[in-house]
Amino acid sequence: MQRYYNKLLTYAYNIVGSYEDAKDLVQDVLEKYITLDKSNIRHESNFLIKSTINHAINFKTRQSKKEVFGEWLPEPVSFENADAKLIKEETATYTMLVLLEYLNPKERAAFILKEGFDYSHAEIAELLEITMENSRQLLSRANKQLKNSKYASYSPHSDQSFETLGRYQKALAQADIVELQNLLVNDIKLSADGGSKVQVVSGSEIGKTATATLLVYVQQHFLMGKTFTFQFFNHQPAICFWEHEKLHNCHILQLNKDGLIEEIYSIVDPDKLRNITRLSHI
């Protein structure tokens, strides 16, 4: 059964947006499967996928967003981490995981299965135990929810990632608000997640001036003297700020085709940073 583990984990992670929770869900599915009478199970793989998806949907349905400092953001994953068991090509971008939070769990699952794994409506209906018409309706609602977002069809642009990261880090270190503004689109949004343990200065800022001012304030008051690494999480570039081997803050960036920053996802929640190891591409 372990041969299915990575695929099951990828399904679960895309639905729940938390690597730790996804691991627990898959482990629970596998442990329960061991005790089942398998005489009527014809396709082990399909059975485990179906069980995992429905378990993840039920978990997401029960899960109430905890009171957090700032905005709730997904747990990022690095594919270069030896402990990460996700299938890279099938794992959603960080931006997409953020967008999927606007959908209910079944809409989220239907969207992921159709758009991420190219399932037919017949296959989705079987997995979710609904009709094909219900599957179409779920996907239609999901698309309507996401279509107003300019990032619904977002795909990462890696060509200019390191150049932008370098300029971004230098501007922060020098408290250069003008240069920061030059790196941001006009309607830039910054979202910060401190979880239940770390209070953030601001959960959300929109616009060049407000965002650049906040970034410099945080740099000068909380990140001075920290070392940094440039890394990738969920297919997107990021800068991580460290004190020795302890990670304090991670900025995941969304870049447009011109290398400008459209979104900044700032994570300071220690529970979401604990699986990140110190890697550097520079």
Enumerate the language-model features and the residues they cover.
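Solvent-exposed, charged amphipathic helical/linker segments at domain boundaries
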Residues: 126, 132-212, 216
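A short, charge-rich alpha-helical start-of-domain segment used by transcription regulators
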Residues: 1-10, 20-23, 39-40
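Sigma70-family region 2
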Residues: 27-44, 63-64, 149-153
